Amino acid sequence: MSRRTHSNSVSRIEFSCFVHATEEESKVTNAVLNLFPEELREDVTKNIYKMVTHGYHGNPIVILRVLLSSEKDSENTFSHIVSSLSEDDFQSLVSTIPERFDHGKLYIRVDKQKAYGGNVSLSESDDVIRIVVSLKPHLRSPQSIENFLISLRKAPTRAA
């Protein structure tokens, strides 16, 4: 199932996370892919940017990044994420909009381990996938963003 929205409120969405030396890169990649609607995953797989850096003790760290610049794909992906949150996480997201929103961007962190298992769960730990949602200019107040999130949660589904 996929979500379809027509509100044109998301201009782009970016995902990033670290793959530490103790983790399998393929598993972390799958965790990131699980945040996308199924019909986008194949294309997203081809557009994962990887950068290798080193930690304080010289251990390799891979940084994975995905940027969706298609407004339609970005909004459908964000709708998928919002709809996949538990009711408690959704309420937490809504209640923390002022802390998460800055200069047109909504910042969300989801649990990397749970994403690997196919669940979307907010997290404030360090082991997260960071999501930056660039919102269109008509979404600048907490109330307008809350209304948008509620509309995504209620968006009708369609067969893929």
Regions found by a protein language model. Name each.
Residues L106-A160:
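Glycine-rich, aromatic-bearing surface loops/beta-hairpins
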Residues F78-S125:
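Long, charge-patterned amphipathic alpha-helical coiled-coil/hairpin "stalk" segments used as oligomerization
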Residues L35-L40, L85-D89, V128-I129, L152-A159:
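A common structural junction motif
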Residues N34, E71, Q91-V94:
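Long compositionally biased, domain-poor regions of proteins
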Residues E42-K72:
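Short, charge-patterned binding micro-sites
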Residues M1-T45:
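Long, hydrophobic N-terminal alpha-helical segment
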Residues E24-K27, K72-S79, G117, R140-E146:
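Short, conserved charged micro-motifs
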Residues C17-A21, F36, L68-K72, K112-K114, ...:
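Beta-strand elements of well-folded, non-transmembrane domains
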